[in-house]
């Protein structure tokens, strides 16, 4: 390829970082004025937008919400994120926030589909929050220990290495993605 034929990718990757209650979610939510946001909500931060005086009601129609109630005992965020990033349509259940949830499929429970392969130049994947995704990875790695209620067992170096590899896979895919990505962290 000749340099004069190269076209720079328009997709942007942004990290919004700050302490709690500093306006991160509100700032990202305002992108809905011009873009369609696909909001992966791991910490219930979307409530901030529902009560924000700066968030216009007409913008809310541009936000597709995927509630992923991630907890220590049920680290759904990491598995769901990995499945979403594989591409193809993933149906995120409203009850558990799990991609293609077997329990919810059996009962015809509601879900919201997501297919990052179909994202265009006006789509933005919002990950709220990277902090929770990192915790989810460690909880996933230590799930057998946690299921035994052994809360005194601290992660060892191998656990941190596994966590790093999982997060590296996720962020390398996001870095190369042909769509916009906004990560919120604290």
Residue ranges and their predicted role:
Residues 2-114, 118-124, 132-136:
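Conserved P-loop
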Residues 117-186:
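P-loop NTPase motor core
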């Amino acid at each position: 390829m000749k340099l004069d034929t190269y076209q720079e990718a328009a997709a942007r990757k942004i990290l919004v970082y700050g302490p709690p209650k500093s306006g991160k979610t509100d700032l990202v939510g305002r992108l809905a004025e011009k873009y369609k946001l696909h909001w992966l909500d791991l910490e219930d931060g979307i409530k901030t937008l529902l009560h924000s005086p700066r968030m216009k009601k007409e913008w809310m129609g541009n936000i597709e919400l995927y509630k992923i109630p991630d907890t220590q005992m049920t680290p759904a965020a990491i598995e769901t994120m990995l499945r979403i990033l594989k591409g193809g349509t993933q149906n995120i259940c409203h009850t558990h926030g799990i991609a293609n949830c077997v329990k919810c499929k059996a009962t015809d429970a509601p879900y919201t589909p997501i297919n990052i392969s179909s994202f265009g130049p006006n789509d933005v994947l919002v990950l709220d929050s990277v902090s929770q995704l990192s915790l989810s990875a460690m909880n996933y790695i230590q799930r057998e220990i946690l299921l035994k209620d052994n809360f005194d067992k601290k992660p060892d170096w191998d656990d941190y290495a596994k966590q790093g590899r999982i997060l590296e896979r996720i962020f390398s895919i996001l870095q190369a993605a042909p769509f916009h990505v906004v990560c919120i962290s604290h």
